Amino acid sequence: MRSHYCGELNASNISQEITLCGWVHRRRDHGGVIFLDVRDREGITQVVFDPDRAESFALADSVRNEFVVKLKGLVRARPEGTVNPNMNTGEIEVLGTELEILNAAKTPPFQLDEHQSVGEDVRLKNRFIDLRRPEIQQKMRFRSKVTSVLRRYLDGNGFLDIETPILTRATPEGARDYLVPSRTQQGSFFALPQSPQLFKQLLMVSGFDRYYQIAKCFRDEDLRADRQPEFTQVDIETSFMSEQEIMAMTEEMIVGLFKELMDIDLGTFPRMPYSEAMETYGSDKPDLRIPLTIVTVSDLMAGVDFKVFSGPATDPKGRVAALKVPGGNALTRKQIDDYTKFVSIYGAKGLAYIKVNDKSNLEEGLQSPIVKFLPVEVRAALLERLEAEDGDLIFFGADSAKIVNEALGALRCKLGDDLNLYTCKWAPLWVVDFPMFEETSDGGITAIHHPFTAPSCSPENLKASPLTALSQAYDMVLNGTELGGGSIRIHQSSMQETVFELLNITKEEQEEKFGFLLDALKFGAPPHGGLAFGLDRLVMLMTGSSSIRDVIAFPKTQSATCLLTQAPGEVSEKQLKELNIRIRKPVVES
């Protein structure tokens, strides 16, 4: 139907007769001449209709925004003074000779260039119109390029694209499963996969050596700006490769991706132990663009006559830490109060601070409600350790180590954003040497990653001291966002059973939920490992989007609903009866 895309035309097409198809982006009537900006996925072309061609002129006069049209015309240079340098097609225009309306359109609920004044709920309800916006179309096209580059790299390195089941069984992987009732096995349920984890391990046992998949995954959890109930990951697994080899290969893949699509050189990724990340940045995904660091001062505060500090300082599970903000004296009392409210989200009971007005005067040069509780020698040691200068502000966290890390880690990132402290645009790294387990609130233990991650020690040492054992896990982090996480997997059944036992999974549960895996590990499972990248988050970062909803064609809301299709929805009594399911209405208390 067409000879060219709208956005393809340029000065090289001058004097050519062309045919275009697309949507009317804008219609203008200038002194008896009608201008139509016609849009398709490649861009916009200006088309001119003059009264000399009465039939096409009359049609052009009748069209409105978002009409679908087909037109023929002659490409010509724009008159002097009308060139638009902001458009790819800004040097030319098309003199329209024929026009056909392929479909009329109702007035859209919002104009494409006015989307910022429209609520997101309106845009998502009319997503088929929202997706016409050039900005969103560019992001969708960029996403397609990302998957194309990644596929090419993996194909070129001997990986096989193999699909794994979507209907599987529920396994404990950290989040709630989406369940699908079985009609043929009444009373039983499938689960949608949270990841292809077990199947890709079985593919390694089967001898496929290198596997990848652009996989849909599902998790029924509370949503944030970077989470969706269904999401896409680039899933990778390989046999006979070490932790270092897997990291080097996937780093090369991401470096190549950024270079090819954005001409950005990410360089070599530094590697940081988990303990250092938590101690210095309060996060296992530190944003290294921000130069602020967290410094432990528990030893300085252990003997002070201030229980808010001395209590956590002497508690084996507590921590007192400081965060220096260079030039932070300029922060107002209201700003400090706002930051105090912010850290309360993470369980902090308050946010102590000291303003350094004159570091040479330890008696009167420090401004703070808490400074009176700190002996002069503690003040001096504190300023020396933090390398504080006049004009700096020091925030403190004092609580359990977990709360201090989370609160000051989040505050560090918020300060970096609020005060624009970024020192570079891109800061990748690997976080390594994760603990195998962490303690739960009820005194039990849970896997930091998942129960199939291999430890760095023997089963005997793991049993003897599970909370000090390290895992062979690694996370790729970019700008404070986890791009991908992976590990070497357990490939021996005895080790897998040991991990299950430590997680208090009984023999019966092991057999019921993981019997197929334990059996497979007894039939010659090779050493193997892998990694999964969050595709949505990767594209979000690369396109500078604030939410992954901007890089997914049909996203869900933060309440896990689709405003376009009104999913999830009720089903008929007939369907429920076929599944032998009865809906129990919630009891409303009067």
UniProtKB/Swiss-Prot annotation:
Organism whose genome encodes this protein:
Marinomonas sp. (strain MWYL1)
User: Keyword Protein biosynthesis, does the record have it?
Assistant: yes
What role does it play? Aspartyl-tRNA synthetase with relaxed tRNA specificity since it is able to aspartylate not only its cognate tRNA(Asp) but also tRNA(Asn). Reaction proceeds in two steps: L-aspartate is first activated by ATP to form Asp-AMP and then transferred to the acceptor end of tRNA(Asp/Asn).
**A molecular function GO annotation:** ATP binding
PANTHER family attached here? ASPARTATE--TRNA LIGASE, MITOCHONDRIAL, ASPARTYL/LYSYL-TRNA SYNTHETASE
Top EC class of this enzyme: ligase
- E.C. number, please? 6.1.1.23
* Reaction(s) this enzyme catalyzes, per UniProt: tRNA(Asx) + L-aspartate + ATP = L-aspartyl-tRNA(Asx) + AMP + diphosphate
Q: Which PROSITE patterns match?
A: AA_TRNA_LIGASE_II
Q: Which is a Gene Ontology cellular component entry for this protein?
A: cytoplasm
Residue span of region Aspartate:
197-200
Q: For L-aspartate, which residues are the binding ones?
A: E173, R219, H449, R489
Q: Which GO terms describe its biological process?
A: aspartyl-tRNA aminoacylation
The family this protein is said to belong to: Belongs to the class-II aminoacyl-tRNA synthetase family. Type 1 subfamily.
Name of the coding gene:
aspS
Q: How does it assemble?
A: Homodimer.
Write down what this protein is called: Aspartate--tRNA(Asp/Asn) ligase
Which top-level group of life is the source organism from?
A: Bacteria
Principal subcellular localisation of the protein = cytoplasm
Residues carrying the site annotation Important for tRNA non-discrimination: H30, G81
Which residues does ATP bind? R219, D220, E221, Q228, E482, G534, L535, D536, R537
Q: Which UniProt keywords apply?
A: Aminoacyl-tRNA synthetase, ATP-binding, Cytoplasm, Ligase, Nucleotide-binding, Protein biosynthesis
Q: Where in the cell is it found?
A: Cytoplasm
InterPro entries on file: Aa-tRNA-synt_II (IPR004364), aa-tRNA-synth_II (IPR006195), aa-tRNA-synth_II/BPL/LPL (IPR045864), Asp-tRNA-ligase_1 (IPR004524), Asp-tRNA-ligase_1_N (IPR047089), Asp/Asn-tRNA-synth_IIb (IPR002312), AspRS_core (IPR047090), GAD-like_sf (IPR004115)
